[in-house]
């Protein structure tokens, strides 16, 4: 039986801003996604006491590789990946369950300094999954691609629908338009906490990520196609849907070379 557990908060201490990052992100202010409408979305789960616990999201980028956040996997656990899922509390008949064989965390990731960036990891699966209408590979952006301000994006994930709210059992989605680096790094937003290797989205005080489903994708519409521009990283310690504190993501386009080299060498 699948159980849920919200990870302990990882807080960046000693930073100059009062708005400390909280690296547990779930979808707030969203709606239930259409069944398997985001077929590259995965559920990352770990084993404890004979039960599997959903802990993070992620993106299937090869048939045997998943992209997620480094902070999701930087403590030793037995992990598995579930693809083709929609309702975590029941068997939809479309799921595939695969063990994680190897975890590659970015070498510069520092769990004590979330604002430094590099919150990205790749998971090699024990076997390749089967692609079908419920399971597809996420499309990654070109290396160095930068989103224009206010680009249409969606965050997806399982979990809390409001700060301190109940966990959602079905996949949620929320519209989060991108916020460019110049705005997001300004003093009235995130300031120096945000780096140019990150993507900001949302910040309207209504829709956001929130505790528990980091690692999942930010899907953005560019030239008529959705691609995964972000890996959910952190939100404000003040709350999930705080105005002018957009959800912050690892910018995937900053790590394309690292992704390709890691997969090729493993």
UniProtKB/Swiss-Prot annotation:
Active site: 71, 119, 214
Reaction catalysis annotation: Hydrolysis of proteins, including elastin. Preferential cleavage: Ala-|-Xaa
Species this protein is from: Macaca fascicularis (Crab-eating macaque)
Pfam families: Trypsin
Enzyme superclass (EC): hydrolase
Function per UniProt: Serine proteases that hydrolyze many proteins in addition to elastin.
Signal peptide region: 1-16
Keywords attached to this entry: Calcium, Disulfide bond, Glycoprotein, Hydrolase, Metal-binding, Protease, Secreted, Serine protease, Signal, Zymogen
Keyword Mitochondrion among UniProt keywords: no
E.C. number: 3.4.21.36
Main location: secreted
Presence of keyword Nucleus: no
GO function terms (MF aspect): metal ion binding; serine-type endopeptidase activity
CDD domains: Tryp_SPc
Protein name stated in the entry: Chymotrypsin-like elastase family member 1
């Amino acid at each position: 039986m699948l159980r849920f557990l919200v990870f302990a908060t990882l807080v960046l201490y000693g930073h100059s801003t009062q708005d400390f990052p909280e690296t547990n992100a779930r979808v707030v202010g969203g709606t239930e996604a259409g069944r398997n409408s985001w077929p590259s979305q995965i559920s990352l789960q770990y084993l404890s006491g004979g039960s599997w616990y959903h802990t993070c999201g992620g993106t299937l980028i090869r048939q045997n590789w998943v992209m997620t956040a480094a902070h999701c996997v930087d403590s030793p656990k037995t992990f598995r990946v579930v693809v083709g899922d929609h309702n975590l509390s029941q068997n939809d008949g479309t799921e595939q369950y695969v063990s994680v064989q190897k975890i590659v965390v970015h070498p510069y990731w520092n769990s004590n300094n979330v604002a430094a960036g590099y919150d990205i990891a790749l998971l090699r699966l024990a076997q390749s999954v089967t692609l079908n209408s419920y399971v597809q590979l996420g499309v990654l952006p070109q290396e160095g691609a930068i989103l224009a301000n206010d680009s249409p994006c969606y965050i997806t994930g399982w979990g809390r629908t409001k700060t301190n709210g109940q966990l959602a059992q079905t996949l949620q989605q929320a519209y989060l338009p991108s916020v460019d680096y110049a705005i997001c790094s300004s003093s009235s937003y995130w300031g120096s906490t945000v780096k140019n290797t990150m993507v900001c989205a949302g910040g309207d005080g209504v829709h956001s990520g929130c505790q528990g489903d980091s690692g999942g994708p930010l899907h953005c519409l560019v030239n008529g196609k959705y691609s995964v521009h972000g890996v959910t990283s952190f939100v404000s310690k003040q709350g999930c849907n705080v105005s002018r504190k957009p959800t912050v993501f690892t910018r995937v386009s900053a790590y394309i070379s690292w992704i390709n080299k890691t997969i090729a060498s493993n």
